[in-house]
């Protein structure tokens, strides 16, 4: 492989950057701002960046800045920890099959309330406070995300199916409501909830929603904020620049496994479907998203379509 790698344990604290370095960063940003002016960026917001108040404020400022310099950010958010907290308060114990939460009627009500009523509105408020014009949506709004029940096959017996309730997979995405908001200078903030043919709600993996939405919007970039530095090789080094073909090789040799699989699969699908670049970024680093997109510095892994 020809990819670049760096030590993933390098100090991510940016507070030591002096005035001269800050000026250099601003100068580096100009060609990127020109290049991406008018382009759409879909951002999956999750992990520590959603729970640390300082990182929340940094994220909101970054999104507003991207909009102000002429880009079109679209935010898709998760909310697993917040859902877990709400269910615990209600005394409802989670039941999992092969790592997936079984989502019955009552759980789905909680999921919808937490994602669309709490988490989404917190994000909208932060972006607006930072000077942006954010609007909260779910996949129901404008008939955006049509979904169906996710079929889960038993990992040991493919002829056996597990019923995991109102966990959905995407049937289609109509991006017209998102495009209309972008045209009016708004920043869409989307909860990953779809609707079925009988108007039932489905909880959908936010990484999957972000990837599919980036594809249908013909986004320039998909940005995934995570709790890890990016894609690591077997020596624990950060791989900063990969092609879709190289990602396939990392799947094949077992370098990418476990909890990173669904995230990387979604990123790979987007890269293969026309999204020019996918960035997997350490959301624990203040302003890492801006630095990754607008400078020559690598603060995560970039997966290129070719």
Curated annotation (Swiss-Prot):
It catalyses: N-acetyl-L-glutamate + ATP = N-acetyl-L-glutamyl 5-phosphate + ADP. Its EC number is 2.7.2.8. Substrate binds at residues 79-80, 101, 203. The record marks 44, 263 as: Transition state stabilizer. SUPFAM superfamilies: Carbamate kinase-like. It comes from Polaromonas naphthalenivorans (strain CJ2). GO terms for cellular component: cytoplasm. This is Acetylglutamate kinase. The keyword RNA-binding does not apply. PANTHER family: N-ACETYLGLUTAMATE SYNTHASE (PTHR23342), N-ACETYLGLUTAMATE SYNTHASE, MITOCHONDRIAL (PTHR23342:SF0). It is found in: Cytoplasm.
């Amino acid at each position: 492989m020809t990819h670049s790698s760096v030590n993933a344990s390098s100090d991510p604290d940016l507070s030591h950057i002096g005035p001269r370095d800050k000026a250099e960063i601003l100068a580096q940003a100009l060609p990127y701002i020109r290049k991406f002016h008018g382009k759409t960026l879909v951002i999956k917001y999750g992990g520590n960046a959603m729970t640390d108040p300082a990182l929340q404020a940094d994220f909101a400022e970054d999104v507003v800045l991207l909009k102000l310099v002429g880009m079109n950010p679209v935010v898709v958010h998760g909310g697993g920890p917040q859902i877990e907290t709400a269910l615990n308060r209600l005394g409802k114990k989670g039941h999992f099959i092969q790592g997936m939460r079984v989502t019955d009627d009552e759980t789905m009500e909680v999921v919808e309330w937490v994602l669309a009523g709490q988490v989404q509105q917190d994000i909208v408020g932060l972006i607006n406070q930072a000077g942006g014009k954010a609007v909260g949506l779910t996949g129901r709004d404008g008939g955006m995300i049509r979904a169906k029940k996710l079929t889960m096959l038993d990992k040991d017996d493919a002829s056996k199916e597990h019923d995991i309730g109102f966990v959905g997979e995407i049937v289609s995405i109509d991006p017209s409501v998102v495009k209309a908001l972008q045209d009016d200078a708004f920043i869409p903030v989307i909860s990953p909830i779809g609707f079925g043919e009988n108007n039932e709600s489905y909880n959908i993996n936010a990484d999957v929603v972000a990837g599919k939405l980036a594809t249908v919007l013909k986004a320039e970039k998909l940005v995934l904020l995570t709790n890890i530095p990016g894609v690591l090789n077997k020596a624990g080094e950060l791989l900063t620049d990969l092609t879709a073909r190289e990602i396939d090789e990392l799947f094949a040799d077992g370098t990418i496994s476990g909890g990173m699989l669904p995230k990387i699969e979604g990123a790979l699908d987007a890269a293969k479907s026309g999204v020019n670049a996918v960035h997997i970024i350490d959301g624990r680093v203040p302003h890492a998203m801006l630095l990754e997109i607008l400078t020559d510095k690598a603060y995560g892994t970039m997966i290129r379509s070719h």
